[in-house]
Regions:
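Long, charged/polar, surface-exposed segments that mediate recognition or autoinhibition
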Residues: 80-145
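A charged, solvent-exposed segment within the mature domains of Sec-exported extracytoplasmic proteins
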Residues: 120-199
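Generic hydrophobic, helix-prone segments enriched in Leu/Val/Ile
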Residues: 38-46, 110-118, 182
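Generic N-terminal leader/processing signal
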Residues: 5-10, 19, 62-64, 68, ...
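Bacterial Sec-dependent N-terminal signal peptides
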Residues: 1-35
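A structural detector for beta-sheet-dominated domains
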Residues: 43, 71-77, 83-88, 100-102, ...
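N-terminal Sec-dependent export signals
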Residues: 1, 13, 29-33, 40, ...
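N-terminal leader/targeting segments
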Residues: 30-95, 199-200
């Protein structure tokens, strides 16, 4: 009898350890990665890409010879201003979406924000018409000596129907200030030029 009791007491720590492991596995299985606020907002913009952004376009603001600017109905976290731009084209309507995220005269502040926005946008996942697009791009460290830095994130070739869709993170000098923008657009060209293609 004493031998059985001793065996039982020896098993209790092992049983507790086993239960703890099962509990930890159960918790980890329930943890689902969540999108940050910026990813959620940009995801709303990208989700309307197949519709030509028609569901998020607001009132016309400015008309120029080559472009027409509209308000955007989607609010993006921390954005100063969001807009949709329609470009002149003889083939089809071409729209791009832009958000001004920061304007400052301090380069270090701009560089820090640029990195934060990149981290937020990297691996952005959006489901469009049954296809999941995961946007990725290599980080480029900005330099105060370079007046224009842009990082392009794209869904690669795993989603061929979305391969022309790009997200650009831009840091550029504007007079004495530094401006950060996020752009969503369709790139028709195969070259490395940034921004939407315009048909002559």
């Amino acid at each position: 009898m004493q031998a059985l009791l001793l065996k039982f007491h020896r098993m209790k720590p092992l049983t507790a350890t086993f239960i703890s492991i099962l509990f930890a596995i159960s918790l980890s299985a329930q943890i689902i990665p969540t999108k940050n606020s910026l990813q959620t907002d940009i995801g709303k913009v990208i989700s309307d890409y197949p519709n030509g952004f028609k569901n998020i376009i607001g009132e016309q603001v400015i008309e120029n010879p080559q472009t027409i600017e509209f308000e955007c109905l989607v609010t993006v976290k921390d954005a100063i201003k969001c807009r949709l731009v329609k470009y002149s084209s003889n083939v089809k309507e071409i729209y791009s979406w832009e958000a001004d995220m920061l304007k400052t005269d301090d380069f270090e502040t701009a560089a820090k924000k640029f990195r934060e926005l990149y981290n937020s946008l990297q691996h952005l996942s959006v489901n469009i018409n049954g296809s999941t697009a995961v946007f990725k791009g290599d980080y480029i460290k900005p330099s105060e000596a370079i007046k224009f830095t842009t990082i392009v994130l794209d869904p690669a070739d795993k989603t061929p129907e979305l391969k022309k869709l790009k997200i650009s993170l831009v840091l550029e000098a504007d007079m004495l200030d530094w401006v950060i923008k996020i752009q969503v657009y369709e790139q028709e060209r195969e070259d490395r030029d940034k921004g939407p293609a315009i048909d002559e």
